[in-house]
Amino acid sequence: MTNIGDHNAAHGAEAAGFRDLKAVHWNFEAPRLYEEALSRKEAQLARGGAIVATTGSHTGRSPKDKFVVRDAGTENEVWWDNNGAITPEQFETLRQDFLKHAEGRELFAQDLYGGADPAYRVKARVFTEFAWHSLFIRNLLIRPDRSEIASYVPDMTIIDLPSFQADPARHGCRSKTVIAIDFSKKLVLIGGSAYAGEMKKSVFTYLNYILPGQGVMPMHCSANAALDAEGGSAIFFGLSGTGKTTLSNDSSRQLLGDDEHGWSNSGIFNFEGGCYAKTIRLSRNAEPEIYATTERFGTVMENVIIDPVTRVPDFDDASLTENTRCAYPLDFIANASATGRAGHPKNIVMLTCDAFGVMPPIAKLTGAEAMYHFLSGYTAKVAGTERGLTGPEATFSTCFGAPFMPRHPSTYGNLLRDLIAKHSVDCWLVNTGWTGGGVGTGRRMPIRVTRRLLSAALDGSLAQAEFRRDPYFGFAVPVSVPGVEPHILTPVKTWANKGAFVETAARLVKMFDDNFKRFEDHVDADVRSAGPTAQAIAA
């Protein structure tokens, strides 16, 4: 095979099992990857300089097609209620078929890092069939210095072949699409999907598996830090589409990252070196920092419609999917951290997209309440972030990221609770979903309200406010906040039909109670008592 580009010649594609490849293009940067993607007609050039690719039938993740090898090493470590299993034999058959499928093809390889803290960093080598996928993952992960490449030996490997189609009978999977992880072999195989987000989430899943054993809390969150040392850092938990990227992009604070972080004894650190922002209905006025990246050379836009003549993106066009995205390096954001690291957080924000419209825009949580709501992970799946999802759907995604958590949620919940207590962190639940009614009758929470409330929480003033006890959920809600209309802080006052509000709130409370039954045997009594019904009875 022909090797083009800088790489470790002693540990090349053969080490991953490849044979008879036509060529491997190693560690290409944006200009060369643009040339390759455009000449192969994988993508188009948008006005402003970004590259635009479409992903076919898969415009979001395929969580039901994700599998973990069940072997002696994972049998008692993986949360099998939440993770599909395949046998080592099925994975090996799949691996051999992947390698056979790759014969005679040209692949692109990137040698990258997952984790900004060198103490917990993972070397991730990613082989892709598409040049634009190679640029995507290069943007999203941490790029090593060129001097490090000659001796680079990966800790994990990803092989992404969208043209490969799995055989459920042969490979033990569900469809022609497969995302299979063998933690023992430190190998991820992605086939049958061109959705680039599968690659970054595979690295995240791997880190979520290995880091708890090192005393590090892996988190599906964005993070930023105050510009002065006194303000501290903040973590924003939330499922895709709840506002993690938008709300952590704040010009008055330094951005660490928008999606994946770790919390160790030294502080918090980004897992990535880029951002993967939703662009549907993106506007220059509302989100200027993110909008500016769509006009930069090097940005990858995914499933964004562009004018066939002018090549101007139409961010309001959801004809392919609501889940339009752009992927760009962190240094495209002017206020991004150069190190991806910060001290221990002073605030934790749990973002929920309440599809019922009965939760307040912000609530202050005790440590026990924080663990309860972290394990509950109530939100709404937003249209487009998963295949087949067309409208908001109320759901409970434990740890605000169940699809990426290989271990039992209590593993992550206990780590989080201990860290909150140790560092005296203020915790907040923020509703970025609906107010004045649920989906169809209410409206989305105004982003200006959310930003004002977050500003008060992060500068420390909100913690000193007067609070009331919410009669349905039990947590503390501020009575008033400067710059926010008082009625919006009390959800029932935003509903025209008060009786419908009471019925809807009671229905959601029951959903919380029913969902948490699966965790009751894994948590202490104070956490069991932190749920809505238990607090209402106690009151």
Curated annotation (Swiss-Prot):
<keyword id="KW-0067">ATP-binding</keyword>
<dbReference type="GO" id="GO:0005829">
    <property type="term" value="C:cytosol"/>
</dbReference>
<dbReference type="InterPro" id="IPR001272">
    <property type="entry name" value="PEP_carboxykinase_ATP"/>
</dbReference>
<feature type="binding site">
    <location>
        <position position="220"/>
    </location>
    <ligand>
        <name>ATP</name>
    </ligand>
</feature>
<feature type="binding site">
    <location>
        <position position="195"/>
    </location>
    <ligand>
        <name>substrate</name>
    </ligand>
</feature>
<feature type="binding site">
    <location>
        <position position="259"/>
    </location>
    <ligand>
        <name>Mn(2+)</name>
    </ligand>
</feature>
<feature type="binding site">
    <location>
        <position position="325"/>
    </location>
    <ligand>
        <name>substrate</name>
    </ligand>
</feature>
<feature type="binding site">
    <location>
        <position position="287"/>
    </location>
    <ligand>
        <name>ATP</name>
    </ligand>
</feature>
<dbReference type="GO" id="GO:0006094">
    <property type="term" value="P:gluconeogenesis"/>
</dbReference>
<dbReference type="InterPro" id="IPR008210">
    <property type="entry name" value="PEP_carboxykinase_N"/>
</dbReference>
<dbReference type="GO" id="GO:0046872">
    <property type="term" value="F:metal ion binding"/>
</dbReference>
<keyword id="KW-0210">Decarboxylase</keyword>
<dbReference type="Pfam" id="PF01293">
    <property type="entry name" value="PEPCK_ATP"/>
</dbReference>
<keyword id="KW-0464">Manganese</keyword>
<dbReference type="InterPro" id="IPR013035">
    <property type="entry name" value="PEP_carboxykinase_C"/>
</dbReference>
<comment type="pathway">
    <text>Carbohydrate biosynthesis; gluconeogenesis.</text>
</comment>
<feature type="binding site">
    <location>
        <position position="201"/>
    </location>
    <ligand>
        <name>ATP</name>
    </ligand>
</feature>
<keyword id="KW-0547">Nucleotide-binding</keyword>
<comment type="function">
    <text>Involved in the gluconeogenesis. Catalyzes the conversion of oxaloacetate (OAA) to phosphoenolpyruvate (PEP) through direct phosphoryl transfer between the nucleoside triphosphate and OAA.</text>
</comment>
<keyword id="KW-0963">Cytoplasm</keyword>
<feature type="binding site">
    <location>
        <position position="325"/>
    </location>
    <ligand>
        <name>ATP</name>
    </ligand>
</feature>
<feature type="binding site">
    <location>
        <begin position="238"/>
        <end position="246"/>
    </location>
    <ligand>
        <name>ATP</name>
    </ligand>
</feature>
<comment type="similarity">
    <text>Belongs to the phosphoenolpyruvate carboxykinase (ATP) family.</text>
</comment>
<feature type="binding site">
    <location>
        <position position="450"/>
    </location>
    <ligand>
        <name>ATP</name>
    </ligand>
</feature>
<keyword id="KW-0312">Gluconeogenesis</keyword>
<feature type="binding site">
    <location>
        <position position="220"/>
    </location>
    <ligand>
        <name>Mn(2+)</name>
    </ligand>
</feature>
<keyword id="KW-0479">Metal-binding</keyword>
<protein>
    <recommendedName>
        <fullName>Phosphoenolpyruvate carboxykinase (ATP)</fullName>
        <ecNumber>4.1.1.49</ecNumber>
    </recommendedName>
</protein>
<dbReference type="GO" id="GO:0004612">
    <property type="term" value="F:phosphoenolpyruvate carboxykinase (ATP) activity"/>
</dbReference>
<keyword id="KW-0456">Lyase</keyword>
<feature type="binding site">
    <location>
        <position position="201"/>
    </location>
    <ligand>
        <name>Mn(2+)</name>
    </ligand>
</feature>
<feature type="binding site">
    <location>
        <position position="61"/>
    </location>
    <ligand>
        <name>substrate</name>
    </ligand>
</feature>
<dbReference type="GO" id="GO:0005524">
    <property type="term" value="F:ATP binding"/>
</dbReference>
<feature type="binding site">
    <location>
        <position position="201"/>
    </location>
    <ligand>
        <name>substrate</name>
    </ligand>
</feature>
